[in-house]
Amino acid sequence: GVGFKAGVKDYRLTYYTPEYNTKETDILAAFRMTPQPGVPAEEAGAAVAAESSTGTWTTVWTDGLTSLDRYKGRCYDIEPVAGEENQYIAYVAYPLDLFEEGSVTNMLTSIVGNVFGFKALRALXXEDLRIPPAYSKTFLGPPHGIQVERDKLNKYGRPLLGCTIKPKLGLSAKNYGRAVYECLRGGLDFTKDDENVNSQPFMRWRDRFLFVAEALFKSQAETGEIKGHYLNATAGTCEEMLKRAVFARELGVPIVMHDYLTGGFTANTSLAFYCRDNGLLLDIHRAMHAVIDRQRNHGMHFRVLAKALRMSGGDHIHAGTVVGKLEGEREVTLGFVDLLRDDYIEKDRSRGIYFTQDWVSMPGVFPVASGGIHVWHMPALTEIFGDDSVLQFGGGTLGHPWGNAPGAVANRVALEACVQARNEGRDLAREGNEIIREASK
């Protein structure tokens, strides 16, 4: 007789295992599931575990040639989401053997590659991943990390200041370099290529790199401080990207940047390796993130993209702001900011952190706050993000009625005033506006 019956089989018979005790080497995932009407939560959770690991819709002859029990993903817990009808958090454990070492690309292909189009689900969102040290140790992570970057730049005890050069498209290389110089001379630490500045007809990358390097060295000589500009090395091929990074290194600039989602994790990890080997810092921009993380009930939360980036490698990552948003969002933002820069982060559901994450000794990433912030936000930003952050003001620098350099001066003065006030024990939340007003005299 035949060894098994043909036909469609319930996933939960194999993949829903509430009695399973997770191993410390397992990769754990928390999924927010919205099953189709009539699909039980256990079946939906089991389906997610199956389709993102060893399963298919039926038993196959070749299942007999391997040990499913050793390799299968397991849905080990399901809890309803408070305040939502028909939404559940499904917890899935994956054996470490399912993943290629040192490949964020493979990890994401396995966990979120296929299952999100699954018919039995109306929507699915990966809320969090627990990366065990046994896996994270196969990655080198950020090229340098927060501490090494501070040492390279010789800047301590305060957040760093940046500015994206606007108008982001249309300036010639010479004028672009001039704008960079004005900002850095005024007191910023960094300026930045916009994420869509690559190598367009109005400004080819090589010309931009040259004029920006000139601006860096001139402003460095005048201020006696180390200056940087995130030169965007993102390109259409990995070879071209590395060629741009090599040229940046030959010019002697301190930092390059990459759009890690549009460029892809494979390209990003290659660039991070190059930067580590050649002493370049790496700024990461998250262009395209909202396509993935904007919907509450479908996609991937940004904290998952942030963890993936820390493994793939970057020294800065743009992480949005918290100013003027809702309180709850502030806690969640701080949750993934800590996941980026701390060694050990406790599970805390109020901050959106579903698992305790131990990064062991993997270097941290500077979160970059940018997007619609200006000098009056400085007290709040200093208080919320603390010292290990980069505060990036685009329009908040270049929009100064007297020009870029005075705009940069205003930001630097405000930052120094806030840091000093905090160190003297003043309450930034209460006295913030007063502190800025005093400083502006």
UniProtKB/Swiss-Prot annotation:
Positions of the record's site feature: Transition state stabilizer: K325
N6,N6,N6-trimethyllysine: residues carrying this PTM: K5
Annotated residues for binding of substrate: N114, T164, K168, R286, H318, S370
Enzyme class: lyase
Transmembrane segments: none
Chain residues that bind Mg(2+): K192, D194, E195
Reactions performed catalytically: 2 (2R)-3-phosphoglycerate + 2 H(+) = D-ribulose 1,5-bisphosphate + CO2 + H2O; D-ribulose 1,5-bisphosphate + O2 = 2-phosphoglycolate + (2R)-3-phosphoglycerate + 2 H(+)
Post-translational modification: The disulfide bond which can form in the large chain dimeric partners within the hexadecamer appears to be associated with oxidative stress and protein turnover.
Residue numbers bearing the N6-carboxylysine modification: K192
Cell compartment(s), UniProt: Plastid, Chloroplast
GO biological process, one term: photorespiration
GO MF assignments: magnesium ion binding; monooxygenase activity; ribulose-bisphosphate carboxylase activity
EC code(s) of this entry: 4.1.1.39
Major localisation: plastid
Cofactor list: Mg(2+)
Catalytic residues, chain numbering: K166 (proton acceptor), H285 (proton acceptor)
GO cellular component: chloroplast
A Pfam family recorded for this sequence: RuBisCO_large_N
Miscellaneous comment as given in the Swiss-Prot or TrEMBL entry: The basic functional RuBisCO is composed of a large chain homodimer in a 'head-to-tail' conformation. In form I RuBisCO this homodimer is arranged in a barrel-like tetramer with the small subunits forming a tetrameric 'cap' on each end of the 'barrel'.
Family designation: Belongs to the RuBisCO large chain family. Type I subfamily.
Functional summary from the UniProt entry: RuBisCO catalyzes two reactions: the carboxylation of D-ribulose 1,5-bisphosphate, the primary event in carbon dioxide fixation, as well as the oxidative fragmentation of the pentose substrate in the photorespiration process. Both reactions occur simultaneously and in competition at the same active site.
Subunit structure: Heterohexadecamer of 8 large chains and 8 small chains; disulfide-linked. The disulfide link is formed within the large subunit homodimers.
Protein name, per record: Ribulose bisphosphate carboxylase large chain
Originating species: Myriopteris lanosa
